[in-house]
Every structure is written in structure tokens, then in C-alpha cells.
């Protein structure tokens, strides 16, 4: 019997073997090509063959200890050899057989076994390690364990740090990439991301407005040329005149200037060491719309009508609303565009911006006529029955309709038709769009109301701006603040303010706060100060920028309430206190400083009560309305912030337990019945 292991391999031997080819081991020398395909099986006991061509043969060798002595003592003993006589080239079939019998180099290399071993070891131990830090997640180590829906486990601090690095969002598993539960993704949201969700509601984009007529030559550019009478005597030519305006043109240019006036009273509101602060009312009036021949064509307007169709507008008030809308439609021209929005317990846009052609006017009348008494609009798909919705949401939608339009007319306006009180109609102070409120509770003659509507639609001044300054003989004063008194009080600026567009003969009131040094002369008389006003606007009829000459206005002598018996002084002081408090509180609300705004409003109300005003006074009622609005806004903000639980160790532990239970339930439902008993193996 042969001892040891036998190894079979292929090699090449020469056809003729010489005695010199016999090696010391008693084996025939192997001579084959140096490019042998299986050279990696060569060992020190298997000698290399010389260069030459030979046939491939299969031989068997027994490596025993006695083989050496036998071959050395008996040189003529025949060798144990097994030859296969084949051709010099192997067939593909033989090659495939050899490749199957021969193991690959990669499978027997130590590096491959090490890599395979490490992979198997990672798969076995990955279920007990954190998928982020790769540390143990065994219980009892004092660290909360988070189990995802895909059954991967993590340390809870690792998950929170990973979410913080991704802006507090963890949408997928860090190991397998599967999506997590919605409550996991939305669990830790900062307060800065909650605020836009409260403010910005899901408002659609209103860019479906009807296109304007685009013609190369605008009809507004034509001016009628007056024909002279043939029988009229021809005047003699007197030469060319340079820049000689006609009397009609000069009168039109003079009438197109903005009128600015100051009130005859000025009240001191604060005084200190070396200075005093007083306020004065300024009234700005736009010029009338020109009615001369060639100037009668007004600028096209984009109008949004906001209709209050709540339950309170039933019966006669609803008919008044319809009649008012018919008057508005009759004053619109073909180039004007109209959109209708109705609101009650909810708001909806009933029609997009459409040109008031014959079809557009007919469609608008049909929408107005189908408004029923209970407040529901048939065929529109919205129920307007109910109470309690603020008009502010409808105004925001109206402003959005004008902001999202694709093509724009040079003038825009919003009409609000309602019977609510003045403090219930919210004016958007930050919007440049003029908002006009039409009270349905006041009976106005139809002809007077038509003139008012026509005046609202006639743009007289576009993009009006004022530059204010103080000129004094004995001391230089300064304008500290300018507040708007038309509509909702708002802070406009200091010296340079912007009033925007104004319709024909529109008048706006401004409250100007001035700070100047005190005159310490022996006479004690205050020096008269002069206010300079520089206006700048665009003429809507010609689209020319106009810069009229500066105006000098004499500021009245400021007086205190104690030194004057004029009731207008005390009224002006109270107006300054309430207006300043409301305007500054809104600036604080925009910065989310609710406590400071509430403190400012309550202190102003206490000061007015101390001055002797009753609760029925307009200033007190305005402050009460602002305090109520502030409390409602603050309540919504607090409710939204408290809806999300603060992230504490206790809440984090509870959240982790809740999510782990959900993951285990889903895992139990998806368990394969054939693997019963292996559900904890986490396949």
C-alpha cells in the first residue's frame, strides 16, 4: 500500500527522455513551457522543465521516505509513470474540465478567508450593536435604546445627534435606508419651523388671470387734433416760440400738484432737559383727475371685490350688497379686470381676474345674482353659512390674487363690502395695495355712491413719496416718527415716507412727531419752525416722473394741555398716545415680542384713562380691540407651541418605548410561520 497523500496534476513531459534528465530523486525531469497555466502548484520538490514543446500528461507520485534510497541504489529501475498521449493543444472541453478541477487562487488565499470571516462575524454581531456608533446596545447600561421599524437598534443619543446634524429630520434608517414612521420624522421640530406653518396657510397660486390686450399702439396714446374753421381768418406767423405752454396746459400742470397742509394745532406730548417732543397732523390730498379733452381716459385697474355673505347680511342688506356690486360693475371699463371673493365662515375666490368685456360683465352679474339669502352660493361648491371668520383671511387672499397675476395693470385696488365695525376690518399695513371699505349699513344715494366709486377707480398719483425736513432759526429740530392715521395706524418712517398710489382727490392724514431743543431765552417765547416738504410721484396718464418744487409749511406753536383751554390740544395728545401705542405694538408683534406689545397697549390705555377718557371714547375702543386681537394671536401661538412635547429625558424614553412597541407589533405581524422560534434572530 502506498503511504501518504497522492496529488494529481497536469504537466508536460518531453517525448524522449534521456538518462540525464533523471533527477536525484529518481523521477523523470519535467520539461514544459515556462508559461504553464498551473505554475502555482510548483513546489521545491517539483522541478521546472526547460524550454521546449511537449505533450501534456498525467502522472502520479507517492512521496515516501523510501523512494529516495530506492532510486539512488537502483538507477535502472523503471519509474512509476502514468502518461496520457494527447495532442499539443488542449480542447476547450479539456480546459473547462481542468478549470473545474483546479481551485482558484482567490478562494485559497488567506486574505479572502479573513474577509469572509469578518463578514460573517459582522452579520452575527450587527444585531447587538448600534448602527451609528457600532457600540453595544445591551440593556442595563443606562442609555435609552431606539428600535426602528426595520428592527435596527441605535442609542437614542446617537439618533438625536444624527437628526440634529440633518436639521432635526430623520427620514430614513441610517443602516438600511428604509423610511421611518411619520411621527419619528416630525417628532422634534424647532419652533422656527412651526411658525411658517401657522402663518402661511395652504394658499393656491392665482396665476389664471385673463390676458390684457397687447396692441402695438395704445388707444390712450391718441390725442384729438382740433380742426380749424375754414372761414376763420388766418393769423400772421409771428415766429417760433420756445417752451411756451398754453393756458390750458399750465392750468392742468398746476392742478396736478399734491396738496399738503398742517393742522392749526400742535400739542406737546413729552418734555425733557433741553428738548421737547410735540406732534402735529399733516393732511395730504391728491390732485383731481383731469377732465379736459384728451385727458379723460383713466388708467386701467385690477380690482378685487371682497363680499361679506355671512348670516348677518340677510334680507335688505344682501340686496344692498348686490346693488352696490351692480354700481361697481357699471363703472368698470373694458380694460379693467375684476375678481370676486366671498367670505363668511370660510373664504373662496368665485372668479379670477377677468376683463370687463360683455362676456366678463355678464359672468360677474350672474355670480352676484346667485348669492342667496342664507349665504350659500349655488353652483360654486362652497357653503358660506356661519359666523366668526375674520375678514383678514379674505384680504390676504385678495392681495395674493393681485400678487400672483401674470400680467398687471398699472393700478390695483381692493373693495370690501361689509357691515362690520371699523375695528373688525383689518387693514394690511405692509401691503402697497389700497383697500377701501364700503359700509353696507350706511344708506348713500346712488349718484353720490357712483361718484365715490369712480373716484376710487381713477388713479391720480402713482408711487407718491414725501421727504420731510425741519428748518429753524435758533435750533435744528428733527422728525422722529411719522404715523398713518388713515385706516389702521402704522409706522411709516422718519423723514422719508412712502404713501403709494392715491386716487383722485383722496385725502390721507399723517401724524408727525417732532423733537426740537427748547428755547432758553429770557422772553420764553418759542421760535417758529418751518417744515419743508418735497414730493415725488409718477403721473399715471403720461408715466412721467414729477418732482414739484419744495413747499415750506409753518409749524404752529406747540402748546401743553395745561397752558391751553383748547380741547383740540388734549384730543391731539390722546390721539398721539393711542396711535403710537398701536403702531409700535404691531412692530413688536412682527418680532414675536408679545409681552412687550401687551405691556405697551395696557400702559397706553391706563394713561388715557388717567387723562379722563371713558370706555366709550374712540381711542379707548381702538386700544381694546388691539388688545383683544393680540390675545387671540398670542393664544394661537401658545397652543401651537404646546402641541409639540418638549424633548426631555423622560419624554424621550417614553417616545422610544412607544416606537419600539410599534416596531415589535409590525414585526410580529410580518413574521414568517416557517421560521417559528427564530423571530428574535432578526433575519
From Swiss-Prot:
InterPro entries documented for this protein: CLCR, VWF_A, vWFA_dom_sf, Znf_RING, Znf_RING/FYVE/PHD
Zinc finger (RING-type): 130-176
Class of this enzyme: transferase
The reaction(s) this protein catalyses: S-ubiquitinyl-[E2 ubiquitin-conjugating enzyme]-L-cysteine + [acceptor protein]-L-lysine = [E2 ubiquitin-conjugating enzyme]-L-cysteine + N(6)-ubiquitinyl-[acceptor protein]-L-lysine
Tissue spec. comment: Expressed in root tips and leaf primordia.
Keywords attached to this entry: Metal-binding, Transferase, Ubl conjugation pathway, Zinc, Zinc-finger
A Gene Ontology BP annotation from the UniProt entry: gravitropism
Function as written in the Swiss-Prot or TrEMBL entry: E3 ubiquitin-protein ligase involved in the regulation of root growth. Acts as a positive regulator of root gravitropism. Possesses E3 protein ligase activity in vitro.
Protein name in the entry: E3 ubiquitin-protein ligase WAVH1
Lineage: Eukaryota, Viridiplantae, Streptophyta, Embryophyta, Tracheophyta
Gene name, Swiss-Prot/TrEMBL: WAVH1
